[in-house]
Structure formats: C-alpha cells, structure tokens
UniProtKB/Swiss-Prot annotation:
The active site is at D94, E158 (proton acceptor). Metallopeptidase that hydrolyzes the Cys-Gly bond of Cys-Gly-S-conjugates. Involved in the formation of the human body odorant 3-methyl-3-sulfanylhexan-1-ol (3M3SH) from odorless axilla secretions. Catalyzes the hydrolysis of the Cys-Gly bond of the Cys-Gly-S-conjugate of 3M3SH, a key precursor secreted by apocrine glands in human axilla skin. The Cys-S-conjugate obtained is then cleaved by the Cys-S-conjugate beta-lyase MetC, which finally releases 3M3SH. One of its GO terms (molecular function) is aminopeptidase activity. It holds the Pfam family M20_dimer. The keyword Metal-binding applies. This is Cysteinylglycine-S-conjugate dipeptidase. PANTHER family: BETA-ALA-HIS DIPEPTIDASE, SUCCINYL-DIAMINOPIMELATE DESUCCINYLASE. It is an enzyme of class 3 (hydrolase). Zn(2+) 2 binds at D125, E159, E163, H428. Its cofactor is Zn(2+). It catalyses: an S-substituted L-cysteinylglycine + H2O = an S-substituted L-cysteine + glycine; S-(1-hydroxy-3-methylhexan-3-yl)-L-cysteinylglycine + H2O = S-(1-hydroxy-3-methylhexan-3-yl)-L-cysteine + glycine; S-benzyl-L-cysteinylglycine + H2O = S-benzyl-L-cysteine + glycine.
Length: 455
C-alpha cells in the first residue's frame, strides 16, 4: 500500500497488517449476525463473543450489556491518564440479512477477493469498520499507547433491532457512554481514496396509509367510470406530494433549502444511484443533487398495494394501500414534518374516500459542527493518511438514531462520522464489498489521532 506520508507525518510507524485485516474480517463475516432472526441467534452470539475476545486482547476492560431488544452492546474501556479527554469509538457487529445467497457471486459468508475488492455480507457495513477500529488500536499499542481514555462501543442490533435497544441503554445508563469526543464508524467516503467526514444525517419516519371507497369489489363493466376506484384515489394522494419536476412538496414545510458543504457532482450522482441512460434526475437545473438528498425533506414511495397484475380482474378496487419513507434534514423536526404529511394525505383524499394513516419509526435528524478542535485534528489525520490536500465534508440521506441520542445526552461532545464504505460497496445489497485500502487508511487516521490529540 502507498501511505508513506501517513507513516512518517507523526514520527510513528503506522503500518496496517493487511494479512491480519483479511483474516480477521474473514472470521467475523463467517459468524453470520443478523439480529431479530431466531434461526441465526447462535451465530449472532458467536460474533459477539469474537468481538469481546478481540477487545480483551487489546487490554480493554470489556463488559457486555443486554439491551431490551435481546442483543448485547459490548463496551471496552481504557481509563484516561490524568485529565486527558475520553474518546468513544462506535461500530456495530450485526448485519442485514444476506437475502438469497444463490444470487451472490460467491458465498456471502466467505470473504472473497475479486478485482481488488473484498466481498461478503458486512464487509463495509459494518464489520469492516469493526476491523478498522481494531487495527487502529493495535497500531496505537505498537507505538507506545495513548494517554487518552477510550470507550469502544460495539452494538449488536443496529440494523434490525426495531426497539432502539442501544438508545434505551444510553438513556438508562448514560455514564457508560460519557465522552469528550464521539467517533461513529458507520459511514464512508464519497469515493475510494477521498477522505470524507459526514456532518448531517437526515431523520425520518414511515407513513402507511390505506384508502377505502367501496364495501367490496364491483364489476368494472357495470360500475367503472362512476364508482370511485381506491387505487385511483391513492395515486391522486401520492401525486400531491410531487411537483412537475419530481421534487417533494409538503404543504407547510420548506422544501427549497440549499446544501452549504461540498457539492455532489451530477454525473457522479447518476453513477452512484445507477440511473439509466436517458432518464433525468429529479428537479431543475437549479436543484443540485446535494440539495435534494442532504438539505431537503424527501418522500419515497416504498410500497403500493392494490391487486397484483398477475391477479388482475375486471373490477373496481375497493381498497388500496401505500407506504412512504420520509426523510427530514436538520434543523427540521421529523415528527413535525411527518404530522404535516399525515395532514396532507387526509386533506388530499378525493371524493370523500376513507383514509387511515399510521406513523412509525420516527427518528430525528442529526447535524454537527466540524470546526471543533478534535474534529479539525481528526480531519488533518485523515488528510495525512490519504495524502490528500482536501477534506470532503458531506451530508447523507441515511439515519443513525444513535447519533441523536448521544448528542442529547452529551451536547458538548464533538462528533465525527466516517468509515470504510464507498458508493461501490453496495451495502445491504447483493455482493456487498469493501476496498481494503479504505480500512487501512481510515485505521491509520484513527491511530494517528489517538496518538497525537492533545499533545
């Protein structure tokens, strides 16, 4: 690997061991760990034991804390020397299900190297970040250790817990997580080799709504044209949330904000989002992709139910149902915007159609100031590790509810969100992968920070 600048910039020998990284990531991936799936409880526990053992090998005081969603959060602690600050390093060892392994190029539970990338479930989200933290901590040990306090937090139910187990553990025992600087290793770079910090996460909610118009189906030949079609009514409601350019519009909510950080190039966005040739991006020429995905609320129709095409018959549909995924940026409130969406659904129902709406999964957006001394120092460490002159600062449309909970309890802490993923990683999808140089470079940056911050 080429990181001479990183290896010499702090007079430390920061040299990741790629063979060890591959071996450990292989082992952790082999312990299949989707949460909330009883048939995989044994291998989820194997992953927890593996992480616990590795943290103990690093000399940390390790404890396991059960959460209300029947997972364990693993916490490894090193006390600070004197009045040195404490740094919290977070990642999670659970994964999303691998779906149908037959559609993967290789077994998703066997780390496979192809064309310079490593493939397997969790390679980037988030077991690659677990390994990154471990490698950084080893390099710190190899260079004499750090006076900083450490709290290494590994969650077991980030993806499918559903009950915010870690959030409730933080609420009940905030002292376990007290830190001056909080590093969230659950993100990634805008591209391989481009050091990136994420400062904004959109919050959001799920809205499921049903429209009823008839007591039951009736023949379209006898009544179609005058009898109100529930599917038609549902389409009318959905269409009210989008203008002629496809932009989300919510009555009473500002959907015109501009992103103030680094831009998201249109062609790069098209490639990352896998937009088909000839298909336009939403918005006008004045709407940048970064505005649309990082700075504004957005609604995506993630489910629509009427009658499947293969079961279609000549009837007027009496009922239809849809689900919105709502994303909301800071400083707006996800709960308040979700309520506005509910009000619009009800107000826009045509013909007196009966409407039922439920709101679930509300999580608030997160934003952080990257100009604090710790994050500024870490940004320089990232630039050192990559030999880069510029640090890219972006937002993301995803949500990590943990960040909001930690910020609520520790409003004076500095936050950095970063990681080993990149747009080619295809996290949550088939053939998830990681570029091993990302694990190496981010580990170098983290190690450099832990060895030099406050000195």
């Amino acid at each position: 690997m080429s990181n001479d600048k990183a290896a010499t910039s702090t007079n430390f020998n920061l040299t990741p061991n790629r063979e060890r990284i591959f071996q450990e990531l292989s082992e952790l991936i082999s312990h299949y760990s989707p949460h909330s799936m009883p048939e995989h409880a044994d291998t989820h526990e194997e992953a927890a034991k593996w992480v616990t053992a590795k943290l103990e090998e690093l000399g940390l005081d390790v404890t396991r804390h059960p959460t209300v969603d029947d997972a364990d959060t693993i916490i490894g602690v090193k006390e600070p020397v004197g009045d040195a600050p404490t740094i919290l390093l977070y990642s999670h060892y659970d994964v999303v299900p691998a779906q149908n392994p037959a559609v993967w190029t290789n077994d998703p539970l066997e780390l496979d190297e192809r064309d310079g990338r490593w493939y397997g479930r969790g390679a980037a989200d988030c077991k690659g970040n677990v390994i990154m933290h471990l490698e950084a901590l080893r390099m710190v040990q190899e260079n004499g250790g750090t006076d900083l306090g450490l709290k290494v937090v590994m969650e077991g139910s980030e993806e499918l817990g559903g009950e915010d187990g870690l959030g409730k553990l933080i609420d009940a025992n905030p002292e376990l997580f007290t830190a001056d600087v909080i590093f969230i290793g659950d993100g990634g770079n805008v591209a391989v080799g481009i050091p990136t910090l994420t400062t904004h996460l959109r919050g959001g909610a799920q809205l499921r709504f049903k429209v009823d118009t008839l007591e039951g189906p009736v023949h379209s030949g006898g009544w179609g044209g005058a009898a109100p079609d529930a599917a038609h009514a549902l389409i009318r409601i959905i269409d009210s949330f989008f203008d002629e350019h496809g932009r989300t519009t919510i009555e009473g909510v500002d959907t015109t904000a501009k992103w103030e950080g680094d831009p998201y190039d249109r062609e790069t966005f098209r490639k990352d989002a896998r937009v088909l040739d000839g298909v336009q991006l939403l918005g006008t020429v004045d709407d940048e992709p970064a505005d649309m995905v990082w700075a504004r609320p957005a609604i995506t129709v993630i489910g629509f139910t009427s009658v499947p095409v293969e079961d279609a018959t000549n009837i007027v549909n009496p009922t239809a149902e849809a689900q919105f995924n709502l994303r909301v940026p800071a400083p707006q409130s996800a709960a308040e915007v979700a309520k506005k969406v509910e009000e619009q659904i009800r107000a826009r129902a045509p013909w007196g159609a009966k409407v039922e709406v439920s709101i679930t999964g509300v999580n608030e957006p997160f934003s952080t100031d990257p100009n604090g001394p710790a994050v500024q120092h870490f940004g320089k460490c990232l630039q050192d590790a990559y030999g880069a002159e510029h640090l890219t600062v972006v937002g993301t449309g995803g949500s990590i509810p943990l960040t909001v909970t930690l910020q609520k309890h520790f409003p004076d802490a500095e936050f950095a969100l970063y990681g080993v993923a990149d747009p080619a990683a295809n996290i949550h999808g088939v053939d998830e992968s990681v570029d091993p140089t990302e694990i190496e470079h981010v580990a170098i940056a983290e190690a450099e920070f832990l060895l030099t911050y406050g000195k």
